[in-house]
């Protein structure tokens, strides 16, 4: 899972454009996932994956997931209002579109990738805790897995639906 808030804050603090730095991270994550897939092949060849051998899981049809967390918090750090506006759409599409481009770049007959917003119950708490300990700006104790700030009472149900509409989720594939 890519901690977008940490990555984007790191880039800004080090004088880089956040998409340039994020591209390095996304490329690295794809290389790690590719190596993980090779490890699974080796384990299966040694008979160590009985569910795969029994046909319950087909390695050739298994997606390698690029998870993301901290998207809203990263946008907040950049001063982008978290509501249905063009700046926020551009930010979300830029970040998630980058991941989708790399998913397509690394796709092969043997490899398929998808991108998912990772549920925040576990990793969102850990990311926020670790980032706070390391001096990053952390606006809440749990990075959420929505496209809006959960505690924002100014958003109504229609706003929340808009923030999960096509313009925002177009590059999520998981």
Tell me what each language-model feature is.
Residues 32-41, 100-110:
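Flexible helix-coil linker/hinge segments at domain or subdomain boundaries
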Residues 84-103:
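Short secondary-structure subsegments characteristic of cysteine-rich extracellular domains
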Residues 55-62, 73-76, 80-82, 100-101, ...:
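Modules that initiate DNA replication and primer synthesis
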Residues 42-56, 96, 109-129:
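A glycine-rich phosphate-binding loop feature that marks nucleotide/adenosyl-phosphate handling sites
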Residues 122-125, 132-174:
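Catalytic alpha/beta core of large soluble enzyme barrels
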Residues 1-6, 68, 115, 168-174:
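Short intrinsically disordered, low-complexity coil segments enriched in acidic
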Residues 8-12, 80-81, 121-126:
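Flexible loop/turn segments at secondary-structure boundaries
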Residues 1-69, 73-76:
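Structured mid-domain segments that build the active-site/substrate or prosthetic-cofactor binding neighborhood
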């Amino acid at each position: 899972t890519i901690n977008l808030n940490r990555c984007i804050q790191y880039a800004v603090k080090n004088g880089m454009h956040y998409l340039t730095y994020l591209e390095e991270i996304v490329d690295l994550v794809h290389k790690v996932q590719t190596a993980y897939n090779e490890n699974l092949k080796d384990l299966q060849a040694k008979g160590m994956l009985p569910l795969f051998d029994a046909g319950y899981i087909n390695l050739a049809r298994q997606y390698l997931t690029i998870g993301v967390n901290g998207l809203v918090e990263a946008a907040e750090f950049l001063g982008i209002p978290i509501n249905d506006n063009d700046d926020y759409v551009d930010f979300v599409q830029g970040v998630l579109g980058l991941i989708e481009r790399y998913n397509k770049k690394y796709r092969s007959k043997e490899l398929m990738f998808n991108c998912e917003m990772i549920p925040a119950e576990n990793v969102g708490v850990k990311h926020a805790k670790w980032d706070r300990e390391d001096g990053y700006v952390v606006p809440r104790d749990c990075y959420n897995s929505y496209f809006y700030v959960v505690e924002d009472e100014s958003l109504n149900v229609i706003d929340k639906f808009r923030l999960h509409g096509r313009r925002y989720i177009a590059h999520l594939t998981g």
